[in-house]
Swiss-Prot record:
Residues 22-38 have a biased composition (Polar residues). One of its GO terms (molecular function) is RNA binding. Residues 162-188, 675-686, 695-707 have a biased composition (Basic and acidic residues). SUPFAM superfamilies: ARM repeat (SSF48371). PANTHER family: NUCLEOLAR PROTEIN 9. The gene is NOP9. This is Nucleolar protein 9. RNA-binding nucleolar protein required for pre-rRNA processing. Involved in production of 18S rRNA and assembly of small ribosomal subunit.
Amino acid sequence: MGKTKSRGRRAEKKEAEKELLQNAQSLAGENDSKVSQPSNIPNTFFGLVDSTEIEYFKQAESTLNINAFETDEERNGFISSVLEEAQGKELKLVTNQICSKLMERLILFADSSQLKAIFETFSGHFASLAFHKYSSHVLETFLVRAAALIELELTQTDEDYNEGHGEERDKDYNEEQERRQKVQEQSLSEKKSVEEMFLNMVNELKPYLSTMIDHQYASHVLRLLILILAGKELPSTTTSNSTLRSKKSKIARKMIEIKDNEDFDRAYQTPPSFKNELREYIQIITKDLDTKRARELSIHKVASPVLQLIIRVEGLVDRERTLWHLVFAKQSEEKVPEEESFVEYLLSDSVGSHFFEGIIKNDGARPQYIERLYKLYMKDRVLKLARRATTGVYIIQALMFKLKPVEVEYILDIIIPELANLISIADNQNLDLARRIVDASIIRGNYRRDDIIQQLFLKFAPNYDLSNPQSSTSTEFLENALQLTGSTLGNTRDDWPTAEERRRALFLEKLMELDYRFIICAWLNFMALPVERFVQMCMHGVFSHVVENALVVEKDEPKNVQILRKRFLNIFQGNIVTLACNSYGSHIVDKLWNFTVFLPMYKDRVALELMGEATKVKDSNYGKLVWKNWGMELFARKKYDWKLLIKAQENEFLGVDEDTERPLKPIELKMNNLARERKEQQERAEQAQMGYNKRKLDELTGNGEKRQKVRGRRRE
């Protein structure tokens, strides 16, 4: 009898887990044989949080997350009570997966005295916290708050400092001896400045710097410390391009809804002592490095960002640029074989290219250093590097904004004729290159702008006739640029727009900013779409921005373009209310107010559609805003005033003030003449009436009798 085959999902899952475990063990064995675990990584155990404590702190974290406090005082009182409950347990809380989130929230909301107390608790254990998976994140948040406190201490006067700290020192002075002793100890701890505490922590971490460089968690703490010591901007922990956290950490923070406070995304004033500490940090890190080890770290997945940062800031304290000259050779006009091999690896490796791009973009390296590497190893193969869509092309993009103008124009001269071939629509490659080419051209005074436009039309709308655009009935421009087929457009499952869709939409918006011909091409493509498909675009989270950015009117609009604009506006007819009540579509309806300038009939059509379903529009949160922005109350009650709004918009578009005279149209001249004649007739009628009234008055009062003329000089 054959072997019985196990069936069912559980059995399959069990087999899969077993296979994964075996693979992981074999991989771990290989890694252990290659890399030995550093012996100086602290691994202090601070204890476990029991189940009852976890429940309490978990509930407290949830309460802070909801933030349902009526006042700040109520929230501060809650934070004080939680900190009091956590007193003496802080270290085991920050190393716990659940409770570390609570400690991070408490640090974000804590006041200066509470932060100082936490600082004292962490003192002596910073190394252990920096190397731990969970506490390292808490420590990063804590360091940002500490940097803000240091700046506060530097900027406030002694009177402010004493006013904020003296009361607590003196309030229990006359109580029993034990209480007095406690207050005095607290007073002494408060006298210690945050700068002193911070420097103690910096010294505590010095023995571990070489290990922190390539450690999965401690390296992030080290990067943040270097930024603070150098007085550089401390980036957000959630933005996609942040240098503060790893990609996984940024995603996790968004999922658990931990938001940064106002202390992030800014630089802080630092005391002079920090420059000395930064110099010592860099000396400790570089003293045991040789060229081979420095290059290994620069292409190490974890250590590479640390070395990028050191190269960026070492010029502040080291005129010799020690680390730069460890990684790259000294200034020379000839190629160095070992350096040439290393640069070639940087240009072809994903981690290496990130490192190379970073040191070019940042202001740390001297321009002559970058120019030397470019001329020796890259200038003669710019096009070849631009074809490396995942590595070398990013180096070329960075160089276009760092080299001298003549070198930038040389790169543009090589790439622009091949731009259409370099962009891959199917693989979504080199769209960023096209954007950077456009930016570099604009900076250089629209250098070869027409050639760039021709190449972009050749790639994204090859059948579009620039000389006769109205003959186009294709949607190839939108399809090639946005890849509508297979996108989330029209999905009923509430799918989030993808990152690729965002990149493509931003690229198309860049094209429309570059030249108005891309906008006209977009109009024609919108009109070629089925109306239902176009309405779906207007209500899509990403593609709606493309439609919105296409609603642009030129100052000196030719007649044929105005006719095309009218045709484009016709496809909105019958869908205005639907769009007005949608979160994305409402922005488009708002934009139609400006897009219908000099087309009052189309304005009336939109307003009539909104008026026809006024109740539905007003009941919608988004519709209310559209109703207000279109001045619909005036349309409903004071049509004449609404027309004045339209007139004011037209004058503003033309740049004509109300006091500035402009050439009048024939109909306006005729109306002015009629008004003048009517005014003159009215004045003559008023004068005649006044004469008649005067004569009547004279007759009634007897003043109308003729006076006898008296001749001679004396007529009394």
